[in-house]
Curated annotation (Swiss-Prot):
It comes from the Eukaryota. This is Mannan endo-1,4-beta-mannosidase F. Belongs to the glycosyl hydrolase 5 (cellulase A) family. It comes from Aspergillus clavatus (strain ATCC 1007 / CBS 513.65 / DSM 816 / NCTC 3887 / NRRL 1 / QM 1276 / 107). SUPFAM superfamilies: (Trans)glycosidases (SSF51445), Cellulose-binding domain (SSF57180). It is found in: Secreted. One of its GO terms (cellular component) is extracellular region.
Amino acid sequence: MRSLSSVALLSAIGAASAQAGPWGQCAGISHTGPTTCESGWSCVYLNDWYSQCQPGAATSSSTTVSSTKQPSSTVAAPSSTTSAHTLPTGSGSFAKTDGLKFNIDGKTKYFAGTNAYWLPFLTNNADVDAVFDHLQQTGLKILRTWGFNDVNTIPGSGTVYFQLHDKATGTSTINTGANGLQRLDYVISAAEKHGIKLIIPFVNNWDDYGGMNAYINAYGGSKTEWYTNEKIQSVYQAYIKAIVSRYRDSPAIFAWELGNEPRCKGCSTDVIYNWVAKTSAYIKSLDPNHMVTTGEEGMGLTVDSDGSYPYSKDEGSDFARNLAAPDIDFGVYHLYVADWGVSDNAWGNRWIKSHAKVCEAAGKPCLFEEYGIKDDHCGDSLKWQKTSLTTTANSADLFWQYGQQLSTGASPNDHYTIYYGTDDWKCAVIDHISQI
C-alpha cells in the first residue's frame, strides 16, 4: 500500500565525536568523519561505499581501517551514535517456517498482525512503547513497518530519515544518528521487549518516503531500469548490508523484505525474478537465520485466473515463479479491490485461495500481508479474514493499517486505518483473534 501521509517528527541530531560510535561510519573515499571506533568495536569494511563500527575484537581503545580498504565512494553517517545509545540486544528464538505454517516462540499456528509503516519515524519513545503495549495486549504478533526512509536532500533539523542519495555528488549517506537509524533501533528494542515480530522492507516502489525514485534521482536510469542498474543495485545492497548487519542477531525480526510492492510495468517477468533471486541470496549470505520474502502484491497468477488486471503479468510480476526462488521462505500478497478495479467479496476470496494453492504447491506458507476496505472495516474484509484463516497454506494475515492516538495527535489516517480501542477495532481485530 502507498503510505499516503508523511510523519516527519523532530529529534535532536547526535553530535559528531572524535571516534565513531557503535554502528557509526568509519571509512570511505571523501569521508571526513571519524576513522576510529570506540573500545570494543572494530571498523569493518562492508562495501565500496561504507565501512562501519561493529562489535568485535578491537585490541585497543580504537581501531583504524587499513588504507587498502578505503572505499571508492562515500557513505557517511551525518551524526554518529554515542556511547549512551543502546542497540537491540534481545535473546530468544528466531521465527521460522514449519511446513505450511509459521513457528514463533516455539508455537506453530496461525498468527494475526498489522502494518504501521510510520512507527520508526516517531521521536517520542513513549508513543512507540504504547503501540507495542497495545499490540501485545491484543494478541497481534507480527508488525510490518518501514525499514527505509530515503531522501535526496537533507531535511529540516531533527526530521527522521535513514538514507541520503545526493544528486549533486551521486553518493549515498546512511544516517546512523539520533534522527536516523537510532529510531529504528528503538522500535526493534521495543519489539523485543514485547515479544512482537517485525517484517522490515528495504525500499519502496512508491515515492512515499523516497522510494526507488530517490535512487533514480541521484544515480540516473528509470523505474523499469531500477532492478538492473548496477550503481543503484550496489547502493541498495550496501543499505541492506548495513541494516542486516545491525539487527541480524535480534529475535524481533520476523523477516527481511526486499521491498514494498515491487513493480516493473511492461517488463519481462525475468527482471523482477532475477532481482528477487539475487537479492534474497545476498541477504541469506549475510543472515542465514532470518526469513526472507519479496513484499510483492501477488500479481501475475495463472491459478484460478479470471483474466482481471491483478491476475495479469502487466506489472512484471510472476507470483509463483518469485515464490520458487530458492532463498524466498514464504509468499506474501495484498488485496485492495477498489484500487484494482474489482469490487466484491467473492473476488477477494478467490484471490486469497488462488495464492494459497500456489503456496501449497511450492511447500511454503503464504502470508496475507496487506488488506482493507476504505471506511468499511467490518464488512467484506471480515469475510476475507475467515477465508484466510480456514484455507490451507494461508498462515498469517496483517491488516492495513494500525492506528493510535499519539502525543502529537492521531497516527496517519488513510481511511483504511483501524484505531485501537474503537468499535471497528473490536469487530475487525478482537473478534478475529478470538477465532484463531
